[in-house]
Amino acid sequence: EWDAVKDTRQKCSGQLRFDAEFDRVYDVQSETQPNWILKDGSATLQISQSASWGQSVVWNPGADKCAQLKDMPATGYQRMLCVEAARVTSTIQVQPAQNWVGWQLLKL
């Protein structure tokens, strides 16, 4: 994984905690199992994506950056998390008459 805030690379496992700005890139592990399972009280959100994306970006602005964002309330970081399918480490090139497929599935 790449931590974009600290500009470091390290392997992480287990639960993620969001107590400050968080911006990390993770390699996609599987198309057949959820890449992310988010729990908030009794609600669970499973997020899967195609391996063709390559990576997932997980982002939360944290309190300091959120206070600077004009389109979010100052405490908005407490109730949001961005998890997006991405292709960060390499480009996707699609030639004429070819196609490329990438998907992300969110399941409650």
List where the protein language model places each region:
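Beta-strand secondary-structure signal
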Residues: 35, 82, 101-105
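Short Pro-Gly-centered flexible turn/kink motifs
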Residues: 93-108
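Short C-terminal domain-edge/linker segments immediately following a structured domain
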Residues: 27-28, 67, 79, 89
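Intrinsically disordered, low-complexity segments enriched in polar/charged residues with Gly/Pro
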Residues: 22-24, 77-81, 93
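Carbohydrate-interacting regions of secretory-pathway proteins
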Residues: 80-81, 85-90, 98-99
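Glycine-rich active-site loops that engage anionic ligands at enzyme catalytic sites
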Residues: 40, 44-81
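Beta-strand-rich interaction surfaces with strong enrichment in secreted/lumenal proteins
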Residues: 35, 89-93
